[in-house]
Each structure stands twice: as structure tokens, then as C-alpha cells.
């Protein structure tokens, strides 16, 4: 845009200025508009000043708000509206503390307050989790007679709740004779942000009339708290109410489906979007791609991607991440190259996705080339996540010495995830000496993670150092660290069934156990011998280890799926941990014996089992 070419004749000076502002996207253009406003006297016009500052504050450009501050500082006596405008602008920015600094200047200037001054200040306090400043502003509200102003009180409730002072938040809420929707939503939002979902739900149930914000706040809270089953249950309640789901609630419901692997429910929401003609914004598009990818349907994910008219870097990244989950490294790299041909610059998350894809498929040279291109070609500094991807890439490929050297030479301090990737590789490739060394480092820097002790003990046991394995196990107990239990889920007819390793709580457990005994006989007839290597930590005899391995959660979930679905139906399983060798072996055999496709998502990736083979090629 050539701002200079805009006509600034006195007759339509204001109109042309506002028109140029709407087309402004760069700071240089903004400066030219400001210069013209100074030259033509528009900076003396209160309407023009307000429009100029409002534009700067609402702009997505990070340069415009600081420039608005420079312009504002040039005024001798800004009125209350302009003070409030600037305070509001910084309260929503990456520097909310500047709202509080502006307020200090406002107090010194003797500019009068009004009811709109305090909500923005309290928003800044909430973003900073600043309890002391909240109490000071509370005192000002009381002193100036705004203690009964609904906007000020609602903002106070939210700020106290967000800063963890629920007693004060509830006290203020209880003092309101007739709380409005904003009052209810403020206190609920505070509890949600603090992760106190039980209290938030109690308050939510007490609301006489719930609006879209109320429902969305609760649903998104459950998703953020990783309570995805509860999120979907509440979303179904919302559908049965008289409140229409908005884009945010739909996006959160789809996110819950993705985490649970609830494909049918995710498809229903997608169908609902199409029927109601809800505008497919970039957020919904990305969440849909992610949902289909995480539910094992990459073809559907690709179809959604193709139908997005304006593909953002987030959409490309979601698709590349999907290919990574499924072990389609070549496809991920292909899309990574294609997005750049389309003029889309990859970001740090895109690089994490494509490097993960390389790691999961053993594309060592390709992964290294992409990693080293980050800073050289894209001016992006690799983060700890990117270094972790390379360690995992080298470790999976058996290049343990190179992985160790890479860690020692990396400019960032290696964390537990970095060392953990190398320890896992030592276990896979049976490098006992290096594994014992890394195990010591890991427990020293991450003493409260059960997996660190388990891997270290198993490394000792692989070398038949039973005393050291027992010592590691004893240390784990002394620290009060528990091993995370294996948990698998299967979604059937809108209900998610959960199984723990050795679980007997399911109402149909007897039927499951009976079916498993039949399946086990068929497995043995087809040459199945249990893989007990990964059971070494338990230090029990072979019979006990075999009994334990047969009760792994994914076996229970698959068995239940065979009972409850028709022949030929795809069985979809979610697992919270990496699938063990025995379960992987068993699932391959089940897919062949029962002629079923089985899609299993474990902690890191997808496994598609068909005709006795797995899509991972036994590389996981």
C-alpha cells in the first residue's frame, strides 16, 4: 500500500485517513499515516485520535501497540477514555504489567476513573496472577464507590479466582443479590483455570440459565484437565439443551474425541458442522485434521485438509503431525516440501512434526539434513524438543555412540527427555554398559518419574545383575514413586470402555476372560510363545510373568472389541504407554486369525495391524 498516494485534501481528510488505516499492515505505513495526521491537524481531533489508537491496539501486528504508546505519551492531558483504551490494550498483550504502570501514571495525572477502568486492570492482574495488585485495585474500587458495579465486581471475582484466592472470589460472588451470567461465568472460569473442575461443575449445575460461554468454559476446562470423557459427556448435554454449540465448544469436543480415539463421535460432530453450515475457520479445520489423524483415519484427515481453502501453517503442521503418528515419514517430508513451494514458511512446531516422522521411520540422513537446515535456511533456533527428536532418531537406528556424542555437543543443557530417549535406545539395542550409565544420570535429574527406575532396573536385569535391579526397585519405593499402570480404552457405540492391566472391575470381565482363554489357545496353535523379556522388573518366575503378561490392558480391550463388534469391523484401541513386545506380537496374530484390522495408538505412534503384519514394520 502506498500511503503517500492517499488524498489528504481538507474536504475528506478524515475519511481518507480512516480508509488508509484499514489497509495498513506495516509500521512504516502507520508512521506515514501518523505524520499526515500531524500535518493536517487531525491529531487535534478526538474522534480521529481515538480511531488511530483503537486501530493500533486491535491490530495483530506486534509493532503497533508500542507505537500507540509513543503517540499516547505525546498528549499533555489524555482524557479518561484514552487512558482506559491504552490500559485495555496492554492488558490483552504479552506485557500486561504495562497496564498497571499506565494506571500508576493515571493516578498521578488526576484523570478521573470510571467503571470501565477496572475490568482491564483486573484482566492484567489475572494474566499476571498478581494477587497483591488485585487487592490494591479492590481497595481503589471500594474507595471510589464502584463496589456495586457489576463489571468491576465480576472482574474482581475472576481475578481472585485465577490467582487462587477462591475464598475471596466466593465471598464476593455470594454478596451479589442476583448474579448475572457474567458473575456465574467469572467464578466458574476462575475455578476452571485453577483446575478445580469439581467445584466448577457444582457451580455450573446451580446456574438457572446457562449460555454458550458457560458450556464452553466447562467443556474446555475438562479438555485442558485431560478429562476428555467428562468433556464429551457435557458436550452431549449441551446438545440436548437449548444452547447451540459455537466454534470453540465444537473445537474442544473434537479435541476430546482426538484424545479418546472416539472416531464415531468425531464424525458426528463433523457431520453436524456440514449440516449447520458453521463456518470452517482455521482452528476447526486444524482440530478436525488432528482428530481424524489421532483416530487412525489419515485419508479423512487429508480430505479435510484439501477442503480448507486458505491453508495456514497450522493446517500443514497438523497434517504432517498426522503422518508422523502413523509412521509415514516419506509422506510427511513430501508435505513439508510442498508447503514451502506454496509459500508457507514452517515454524518450530512444523519442524518437530517432520523430525518425529523421520525418527519413527528410520530416515536418519533426511532427519539430520532437516534439523541442520532450521537455523541455516529458516533462521529458527532448534529447541530442546528438536534436539530430542534427533537423539531419538539416532537411538532408534542403533547409532548410540553418535547419539551420546550429539547430546554432549548440543548447546542446550540436556533434560530428562533427552537422556530418556537414549536410555530407551540402549534397552532396545541391548547396550548394557551405556544404559547403566544413562540410568544413573536420569534418576539423578528426574527422581520422581517411575519410568526412569523401571528402564534402569530392566537394563540391570538384562545383564542378570539381579541385586542391582532389586536395589533400583527398592530406591523407587523409598522415593514413593509409583509405576504408571497400563491403561487401554476402546470406544463402542458412543461409550468409552477403560481397562487397566490386570483389571477385574469391568462389568463383563468374566465374559472377557472366557473369550481370552479361547483366543489364547488359538494363538498357541498358531505358534505363539510369550515374550517375557520386558517383564524382568517383576523378578518373578516364568509362570507368574506369563500370567501377568496375559492381563495387559490392550489384550483385554481387544478381546472386548472382538466380543462386541461384528466380524470384519475395525477394532480401535488407545494405550497410554508404549505397546510391549508381547502385546505387539499377539495383536499381529489376532489380526491374522480373526481377519480383523486393528488400529492401536500407543503413547507415541499408531500401529495398523492387518493379516499378521504391522504398519510400523516392527520398528517402534
Curated annotation (Swiss-Prot):
Disulfide bonds: none annotated. This is Pentatricopeptide repeat-containing protein At5g66520. Belongs to the PPR family. PCMP-H subfamily. Signal peptide: none annotated. It comes from the Eukaryota. Residues 418-493 are annotated as: Type E motif. InterPro entries: DYW_dom, E_motif, Eplus_motif, Pentatricopeptide_rpt, PPR_At4g14850-like_plant, TPR-like_helical_dom_sf. Residues 525-620 are annotated as: Type DYW motif. GO terms for biological process: chloroplast RNA modification; cytidine to uridine editing. Residues 494-524 are annotated as: Type E(+) motif. Gene3D superfamilies: Tetratricopeptide repeat domain (1.25.40.10). Keywords: Repeat. PPR repeats lie at residues 79-113, 114-148, 149-179, 180-210, 211-245, 246-280, 281-311, 312-346, 347-382, 383-413. It comes from Arabidopsis thaliana. PROSITE patterns: PPR. One of its GO terms (cellular component) is chloroplast. GO terms for molecular function: mRNA binding; zinc ion binding.
Amino acid at each position: 500500500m502506498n500511503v503517500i498516494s492517499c488524498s489528504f485534501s481538507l474536504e475528506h481528510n478524515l475519511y481518507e485517513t480512516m480508509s488508509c488505516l484499514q489497509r495498513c499492515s506495516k509500521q512504516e505505513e502507520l508512521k506515514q499515516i501518523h505524520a499526515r495526521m500531524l500535518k493536517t491537524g487531525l491529531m487535534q481531533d478526538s474522534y480521529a485520535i481515538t480511531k488511530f489508537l483503537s486501530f493500533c491496539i486491535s491490530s495483530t501486528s506486534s509493532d503497533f501497540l508500542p507505537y500507540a504508546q509513543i503517540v499516547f505519551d505525546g498528549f499533555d492531558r489524555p482524557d479518561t477514555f484514552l487512558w482506559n483504551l491504552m490500559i485495555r490494550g496492554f492488558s490483552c498483550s504479552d506485557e500486561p504489567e504495562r497496564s498497571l504502570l499506565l494506571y500508576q501514571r493515571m493516578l498521578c495525572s488526576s484523570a478521573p476513573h470510571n467503571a470501565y477502568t477496572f475490568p482491564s486492570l483486573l484482566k492484567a492482574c489475572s494474566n499476571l496472577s498478581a494477587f497483591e495488585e488485585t487487592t490494591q485495585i479492590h481497595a481503589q474500587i471500594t474507595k471510589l464507590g464502584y463496589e456495586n458495579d457489576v463489571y468491576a465486581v465480576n472482574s474482581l471475582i475472576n481475578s481472585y479466582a485465577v490467582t487462587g484466592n477462591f475464598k475471596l472470589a466466593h465471598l464476593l460472588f455470594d454478596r451479589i443479590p442476583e448474579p448475572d451470567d457474567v458473575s456465574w461465568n467469572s467464578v466458574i472460569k476462575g475455578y476452571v483455570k485453577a483446575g478445580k473442575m469439581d467445584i466448577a461443575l457444582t457451580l455450573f449445575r446451580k446456574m438457572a440459565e446457562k449460555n454458550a460461554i458457560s458450556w464452553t468454559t466447562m467443556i474446555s476446562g475438562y479438555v485442558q484437565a485431560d478429562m476428555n470423557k467428562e468433556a464429551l459427556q457435557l458436550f452431549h448435554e449441551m446438545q440436548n439443551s437449548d444452547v447451540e454449540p459455537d466454534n470453540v465448544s465444537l473445537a474442544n469436543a473434537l479435541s476430546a474425541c482426538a484424545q479418546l480415539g472416539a472416531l464415531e463421535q468425531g464424525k458426528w460432530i463433523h457431520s453436524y458442522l456440514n449440516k449447520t453450515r458453521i463456518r470452517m475457520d482455521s482452528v476447526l479445520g486444524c482440530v478436525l485434521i488432528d482428530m481424524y489423524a489421532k483416530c487412525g483415519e489419515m485419508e479423512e484427515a487429508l480430505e479435510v485438509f484439501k477442503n480448507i481453502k486458505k491453508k495456514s501453517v497450522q493446517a500443514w503442521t497438523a497434517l504432517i503431525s498426522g503422518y508422523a503418528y502413523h509412521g509415514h515419514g516419506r509422506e510427511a517430508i513430501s508435505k513439508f516440501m510442498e508447503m514451502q513451494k506454496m509459500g508457507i514458511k514452517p515454524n518450530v512446531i512444523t519442524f518437530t512434526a517432520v523430525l518425529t516422522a523421520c525418527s519413527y521411520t528410520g530416515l536418519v540422513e533426511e532427519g539430520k539434513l532437516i534439523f541442520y537446515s532450521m537455523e541455516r535456511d529458516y533462521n529458527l533456533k532448534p529447541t530442546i524438543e528438536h534436539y530430542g527428536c534427533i537423539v531419538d532418531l539416532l537411538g532408534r537406528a542403533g547409532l548410540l555412540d553418535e547419539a551420546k556424542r550429539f547430546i554432549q555437543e548440543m548447546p542446550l543443557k540436556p533434560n530428562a527427555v533427552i537422556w530418556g530417549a537414549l536410555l530407551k535406545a540402549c534397552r532396545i539395542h541391548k547396550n548394557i554398559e551405556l544404559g547403566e550409565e544413562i540410568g544413573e544420570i536420569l534418576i539423578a535429574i528426574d527422581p520422581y518419574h517411575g519410568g526412569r527406575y523401571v528402564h534402569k532396573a530392566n537394563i540391570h536385569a538384562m545383564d542378570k545383575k539381579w541385586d542391582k535391579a532389586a536395589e533400583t526397585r527398592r530406591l523407587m519405593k523409598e522415593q514413593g514413586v509409583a509405576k504408571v499402570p497400563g491403561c487401554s480404552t476402546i470406544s463402542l457405540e458412543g461409550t468409552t470402555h477403560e481397562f487397566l492391566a490386570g483389571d477385574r472391575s469391568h462389568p463383563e470381565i468374566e465374559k472377557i476372560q472366557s473369550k481370552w482363554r479361547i483366543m489364547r489357545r488359538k494363538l498357541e496353535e498358531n505358534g505363539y510363545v510369550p515374550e517375557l523379556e520386558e517383564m524382568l522388573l517383576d523378578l518373578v518366575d516364568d509362570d507368574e510373568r506369563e500370567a501377568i503378561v496375559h492381563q495387559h490392558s490392550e489384550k483385554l480391550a481387544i478381546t472386548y472389541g472382538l466380543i462386541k463388534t461384528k466380524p470384519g469391523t475395525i477394532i480401535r484401541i488407545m494405550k497410554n504407554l508404549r505397546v510391549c513386545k508381547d502385546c505387539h506380537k499377539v495383536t499381529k496374530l489376532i489380526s491374522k486369525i480373526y481377519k480383523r484390522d486393528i488400529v492401536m495408538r500407543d503413547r507415541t505412534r499408531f500401529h495398523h495391524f492387518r493379516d499378521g503384519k504391522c504398519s510400523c514394520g516392527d520398528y517402534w
